[in-house]
Amino acid sequence: MRRTLVYGLGESGEAATRALLQRGERPLAADAASGEGPRRVLEELGVEGVLGAGPEVLDGVDRVVVSPGVRPRDAVLREARRRGIPVISEVGLGLELLGPGVRVAAVTGTNGKTTVVDMARHILRVAGVAHAVAGNSWRALTGCLEEVRRAGVLVLEVSSFQLHHLPPPGFEVAALLNVRPDHLNWHSSFEEYARDKLRVFGGQGPGDLALLSADDPICRRAAGGLRAEVVLVGEGETGVRDGRLLLRGEFLAGERELGFAGGHNLKNALFAAAAAARLGAGLEAIREALRGYRLKPHRMQVVAEEGGVTYIDDSKATNPAAVAAALLSLGGRPAVLILGGSEKETDFEEVLPHLGGCRAVVCQGEAGPRLRDFLSERWGGEVVLAGDLASAVEAARRLARPGDAVLLSPGCASFDQFSGYEERGEAFARLAGGRRAVRG
């Protein structure tokens, strides 16, 4: 019997190990760490395991299923490549175990993929189309295989980490929303990152659908070489014209009818509508769903209003492109911007043209000093350095004036102070002194 190593025992690694056990296989489970988390997984599963694993764990192994948190430069993965041992992602294993018969719409992109998946599932729910959702920000695919088989339709969010080790998947629908510099501490270069994003179109044929952003240069260059039917979202018959959202020339909704704002979110809605339509949602259901949709938390969400100042949680903005989109969506409203978090060494050059409406920028967290130095040199406005989010909110409160927004759009991950962007957003809401608002 083939011997599979599951390497990395986070949520996806645990789910992959369970799925293999349910198939009657006896995988080897391993993690480079040796802490309580991986140890608990091994005890619960009762599977052979190795903690503090090094390259020797590959002895007798025929393939490796790798968790997305493991970087390609990891010693075990380097040795696997040297030995010619196949390496696949947990998503790749999930697709293999699913087998044929499930229609899959896969969504990737630097920004917006979780929102597009959430919009698509909302549309499918309103349309009465049975479906399941998995991947990246959702459940591990290998942890919900039976549900996916029963539904027959899967909306799958895939990250560059998951695509890096994914064989050509042949998705019926593949969507690439945008490609901006991000995760360069994981990928060896931006070029590798972009190549991994484009792997979402691997294995597609003329009967499949490829959705790409019309205004993203990498998407436009890639579109001409794809075998699937290509729709460039944001121009022509699938775009926004005179404040009207159109899908293949059919009217969906006016901007003012929607419960969310921002050009990036309108485009997200078009991606979701195009994918859902291919999976069986009718036009009337799409129209109804979009008019009733509200964004998930931590995406340009108003969390407090105090003294004429509005506090906006955009904690999900973990790269510079997302910060630029957030500032653009303010429409020139004066703002105090809170930037910073854990360091990813990303270039904030593309944020500079959008700082015109900012009264000040507060830089905080691990990346704070670098961002302070960058902005002090390249931008003429007021720049303040704060040690952490709490002191950043206090500084922003002092700087803001009635009518301003205090915008948490960090452009960085959160792991210097928090377990994730959700915890960071909740902390911001508490520090701002308000409850979460219901609007957009």
Swiss-Prot record:
Annotated GO biological process: cell division; cell wall organization; peptidoglycan biosynthetic process; regulation of cell shape
Protein EC: 6.3.2.9
Record localization: Cytoplasm
Catalytic activity: UDP-N-acetyl-alpha-D-muramoyl-L-alanine + D-glutamate + ATP = UDP-N-acetyl-alpha-D-muramoyl-L-alanyl-D-glutamate + ADP + phosphate + H(+)
GO molecular function: ATP binding; UDP-N-acetylmuramoylalanine-D-glutamate ligase activity
Free-text function comment from the UniProt entry: Cell wall formation. Catalyzes the addition of glutamate to the nucleotide precursor UDP-N-acetylmuramoyl-L-alanine (UMA).
Name recorded for this polypeptide: UDP-N-acetylmuramoylalanine--D-glutamate ligase
Organism for this UniProt entry: Rubrobacter xylanophilus (strain DSM 9941 / JCM 11954 / NBRC 16129 / PRD-1)
Lineage: Bacteria, Bacillati, Actinomycetota, Rubrobacteria, Rubrobacterales
